[in-house]
Amino acid sequence: MRLSVCAAISHGRVFRRMGLGPESRIHLLRNLLTGLVRHERIEAPWARVDEMRGYAEKLIDYGKLGDTNERAMRMADFWLTEKDLIPKLFQVLAPRYKDQNGGYTRMRQIPNRSLDRAKMAVIEYKGNCLPPLPLPRRDSHLTLLNQLLQGLRQDLSQSQEASNHSSHTAQTPGI
């Protein structure tokens, strides 16, 4: 039983190599999906979150089919390792996105893990009751616009200093 999702093909591989093999990869994805459905926001290495995102979106699509659909129930039973989360998928998450086609998750990069400097990310279902994630600041002093503004300010201050200096010397009579 496989959940088919298109992925970028890279020299014959259609998915990332995670874990110890294909079975380990599936177990890892199932555990991540279960955690996401339970908590509606999880933190994990960026590659795992990016790989899991498509499966999380597809799981909501199956949830929207309803709990009377046999295929949807089989998919929910396979991907959710904790069976008490199956009603949450069909009764809480699927109705939340009934008018939305795709884009159920939000993924944000967070600072790297301190031990091994692994690139980390947070994935969450949109519309959850958790406090919103802070947006990253994009107005760094290194952006092109801020560099240009800084140069303009320096030019203006230099021209003002030059004009002040010339007017000051013109006003004071020579002794």
UniProtKB/Swiss-Prot annotation:
SUPFAM superfamilies to which the protein is assigned, alphabetical: Prokaryotic ribosomal protein L17
Keyword line: Mitochondrion, Ribonucleoprotein, Ribosomal protein, Transit peptide
Primary localization: mitochondrion
Keyword Phosphoprotein: no
Regions of compositional bias (Polar residues) in chain numbering: 157-175
Pfam families documented for this protein: Ribosomal_L17
GO cellular component assignments: mitochondrial large ribosomal subunit
InterPro entries reported in the protein's UniProt record: Ribosomal_bL17, Ribosomal_bL17_sf
Record-level GO BP terms: translation
Stretches for region Disordered: 155-175
Subunit structure: Component of the mitochondrial ribosome large subunit (39S) which comprises a 16S rRNA and about 50 distinct proteins.
PANTHER family per the UniProt record, alphabetical: LARGE RIBOSOMAL SUBUNIT PROTEIN BL17M, RIBOSOMAL PROTEIN L17
Protein family per UniProt: Belongs to the bacterial ribosomal protein bL17 family.
Protein name stated in the entry: Large ribosomal subunit protein bL17m
Gene: MRPL17
